[in-house]
Amino acid sequence: RDNPKLIYASASGWGPLGPESQEPAFDYLGLARSGIMFAAGEPESPPTGLVGGISDQMGAIMLAHGVVLAVLARERYGMGQEVSVSHLSSMMALQGLSVSLACLLDRDFPRQARDRAWNPMWNHYRCADGRWLALAHLQPDRYWEHFCRAVGRPEMASDPRFASALEREQHAAEAVASLDEIFLERTAEEWVGFLKEKGDFIVTPINSVADLLHDQQVVENRYLHECDHPDMGRVRVAGPPVGLSETPAQVAFPAPHLGEHTEQVLQEVGGYSSREIESLKQEGVI
């Protein structure tokens, strides 16, 4: 009422409506409720946990998107509004394709077993150095014969069990087992270079998060940024994922301490005076 152009943003676990709207939530519960823990892992495995605060970060990203939309709406229509997101809504958005498929099919998109992948050319394999390699060929018949000859197994191309995508699906365990043996012959890095030299194969090594720190693509695209931290000195952090040719984004400062900007926000957004802010402190409001 006092400021009709105010944009107020809130983030919750389960959304502003419904019987659980006031229930607490953490990142792990956001993962659990969203369905993603049953989307990852092998078919017979229990729900698969994901580390790294995925649900928390998705909630923050979606909240930021919502605020930007509200600012744009205010510029166009002259009104503020409330912006709300939740762990649940954000994680559903992240899985938009899977959620839409479930709506159409009334069932989950099935997990894929690595050792009997319906498409052995869309799978991952352990290499001689212990690292894993991912193949991603959605048109496997286009690549299969060339692949078999490239890796020195021409007999697999003429094997009736593997003659087409349908036969390979019906004999998936045998096909994957054969490829398992093949990929143990070289390191992951060697396989990437070898396959790219032999043809237009679609392949990449599977990184751990720590591997990203030394990945040439990460380095050259500046997906890691450096910034000064008041407690830790010069640190590297994940940078903005969007590249802007004329106004490149950068990490200006680290995450703030709890309450670090309370006074600044009250003064700049709320119009509070220093005396009013001091009064709020004495009353224990802030």
Map each language-model feature to its residues.
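Flexible, small-/acidic-enriched active-site or ligand-binding loops
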Residues: D231-S279
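A glycine-rich dinucleotide-binding beta-alpha-beta segment and adjacent secondary-structure elements
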Residues: K196-A252
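Aromatic-enriched alpha-helical interface/lid elements that frame and gate functional surfaces
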Residues: M121-G199
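Short linear loop/turn motifs
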Residues: S158-Q170, I206-H214, R275-I286
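Active-site-adjacent "lid/gating" segments in soluble enzymes
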Residues: R1-L138, E145
